[in-house]
Amino acid sequence: MYRVDILIPTARFVFSVEDGRTHVLPEFRSPEAFVTYRRLRDEQPVVGMTTFPNTVLLRGERTIVVDPGLPLQNEPVVRALATRGLDPGDVDLIVLTHAHLDHAGACADLMAPVAVHELETRSPSWIIVGGLLELLSLQRLAGDEGELAPGVAWVRTPGHCDGHISLRVDTTEGPVVLCGDTIGPGRAEFDAMRPSGPAAAELLGSWQRIRAWGPAKVIAGHLAPFAP
């Protein structure tokens, strides 16, 4: 059985530039801040956003970090590990739900092997993150499902991107699913099982896989953990 902890919780920081000054909005909860960002794009000439995912620590037979985050999160992740009595060298594996920069950019200070689906290594996002990741030891996942360790399974959950994966982690409280950006930026469509957009059919299939696991808890990339 594994213990699941969030090392760095998700947050979004939205800012606007007015009269030569940067104004950071106080709202940082991920879904609400995303809605604010989209609204402000129609109201303000210069608006920006940066976002951190949930960075998750799995402790059991192996010590695994899932989605370390943006490059600027290298030091915070190391410090968060230290508060739990861990050094970077204690990490056996980094797992990327997908290879977008906000999930895959903070691997350097951990220096552990990186597991990512092989489809992501052929995606446009690999142009941005691949140079760093290929300096590390890559574990290229292939196919539609597999096991990273006893008690940690993965399944391909396309929709957000083709090589996206989700994890099912066995814990004493029941299965915990880490699904990256397969769900989000909000929960409403997942709760109703009615995805929208050009990848709706793929997302619905991915959501059905997640529900079929019967999770006690779901941790998405940019949402607070929830029980489905």
Enumerate the language-model features and the residues they cover:
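Metallo-beta-lactamase
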Residues: 79, 86, 92, 115-156, 162-228, ...
